[in-house]
Amino acid sequence: MNNNNTGSHAPETSPSRRTFVKSMSAAGLGLGLAGIARPSRAQAPAAKPGRAKILKFGSLGTDIHPATISARAFADIVNKGTGGAIDVQVFPSAQLGGEREVAEGMLIGSVQGMSLTLAVLGNWVPEAQLFELPFLFRDEQHALAVMSSPIADEMAEKFTPKGFRVLGYPIGGIRHPMAKFPINVPADVKGKKMRTIQSPLHITLWQTLGAIPTPLPPGEIYGGMQTGVIDFFDNAKSSYWDMKWYEVAPYLTELSHIYTFSAFTIAERFWQGLTPEQQKVVRDAAGQTSLRHTQLVLEDDSVALKKSVEKGTKVIVADRKPWQDAMTPIWTQFGAKVGGMPAIQKVVAYRG
């Protein structure tokens, strides 16, 4: 991926992401996960008074969530690598607001960074919703290969004119339905209130299945399930455990219908205020910690499901065919917004 000042040149490949896909592929997506260190809160070197550039970096996750862990690792690398000239301050648990609020904050200068889902960034670059299409990816290996390819690098270039500098694509999670009731087939969600993210694609997707989309931030899911504001939602297994959603949504249907990738994003206005040397430190740190984020998510998903089952979660392994038949027609509906059917087929056919 090209991350120079102008953003006008052809994208270059991120070596760290390509290496990760190759190594994960070689070991069935499992190589090296157990040895990933979980960093403590970053301690930045002291900067000269009045000289430090403040980089407020948001995270929706708690302190133990992969997004926050990797954000603190990013802070540590940047703070030390710039000798304190950049002071990265991490704000977990949505302290800076939801994704939409943080993205808007980047544009006005109140926030400088966050790993934002492509679904939310699709409000500014509709083509980014390409990677959110249901059943677009065959499996984890296919998804990771595509997101470390020129296809994803070219997408990153589209964000720069909109005010966002995309420096990596950590996986945010693999979505599965989580509910108060058993979900086996698409008809099971008809008439049910479904918590969605603030994405036109996600809202439309569940509307086509007869559900009633109800956009809510992650922090309101637990209460929404308790009070009946929503009946079900979809999310990653790691978040299901971390947020204790198993207490209010005892049924988890393994579906893997959407692979949610985030864009490691720095506000373009902040990026342009950095020296070339500082940009390199930030760019390299983003690459390293996007890799860390992905590794932790894949590791945590496996562990989280086991822990949730011990707490009473009932896991349903659904037949994917009826869901594919019900969901993939949205490809045609959103095709024009994501670059046309050729763009979709390019991803489907990608082999790495």
Where do the language-model regions lie?
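N-terminal acidic, proline/glycine-rich, low-complexity intrinsically disordered segments
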Residues: 1-7
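Short beta-strand-centered segments that line the small-molecule binding cleft or hinge
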Residues: 145
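N-terminal secretory/targeting leader peptides
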Residues: 2, 13-142, 150-352
